[in-house]
Regions:
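Short, solvent-exposed mixed-charge patches
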Residues: 181-182
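Mid-length scaffold segments of soluble, non-membrane domains
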Residues: 58, 62-136
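Short polybasic amphipathic segments
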Residues: 23-25, 138-141
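N-terminal structural module
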Residues: 13-65
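Bacterial N-terminal signal peptides
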Residues: 1-7
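Sec/Tat signal peptide C-region and signal peptidase I cleavage site
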Residues: 8-12
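Short strand-turn-strand beta-turns centered on an Asx-Gly dipeptide
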Residues: 143-146
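Flexible glycine-rich active-site/ligand-binding loops centered on an Asp-His dyad
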Residues: 150-175
Length: 182
């Protein structure tokens, strides 16, 4: 007699270092699903955990970038990072994944994002930094739930932010795989 097994999706929190990523996240009256989570290491040092929350699961960068609705990249710091290093890492990820023309077209938005990042200052172990994209086509950055600076308009900016972790030259290829694991 044949047995029929049902495959039930596993929706469970993931813990990376001391940071727990719940299977769902509520943002602006929308429930986002954890697509994947992983670890960012630099020279064998755990720097942060990252989780990608989306309206629905996605397996490729293209799916994530083209998806409508709210999105969040959540970083959970596993060590203290000074402001300059945090901003430099953001800049590096953007430079590696955009052309000069793309950066020129987004120069005002990128300057606004860098200004927001500079307002954050040093981040401490245990801090949660969210890069949010809203249905109103705005990018915002929060630290421990507190909005830093102003929201920045434009869908193209958030696509650029996503490419830091999901682009062709993502800041960490293993982390990219983990975020797209779903």
């Amino acid at each position: 007699m044949a047995s029929l097994a049902m495959s039930v999706p596993s929706f469970a929190a993931q813990t990376i270092g001391d940071i727990t990523y719940e299977d769902q996240l509520n943002k602006e009256k929308t429930t986002l699903k954890l697509n994947g989570a992983g670890l960012r290491e630099i020279l064998f040092v755990d720097v942060y955990a990252a989780g990608l929350y989306l309206p629905q699961k996605a397996a490729t960068t293209e799916e994530v970038i083209s998806m409508n609705g709210n999105k969040t990249v959540r970083l959970g710091l596993l060590r203290d990072v000074d402001a300059a290093d945090f901003v430099d890492a953001l800049n590096e990820g953007i430079l590696d994944n955009t052309t000069e023309d793309e950066r020129q077209a987004l120069s005002t938005e990128l300057q606004s994002l860098i200004a927001v990042m500079n307002k954050i200052g040093d981040v401490k172990k245990g801090d949660i930094v969210d890069f949010d994209y809203s249905q109103t086509h705005e990018t915002s950055v929060t630290v421990n739930g507190k909005l830093i600076g102003e929201k920045i308009g434009g869908e193209a900016l958030y696509r650029t932010v996503l490419k830091i972790w999901l682009g062709e030259k993502a800041i960490d290829s293993d982390l990219k795989k983990s975020l797209l694991k779903n």
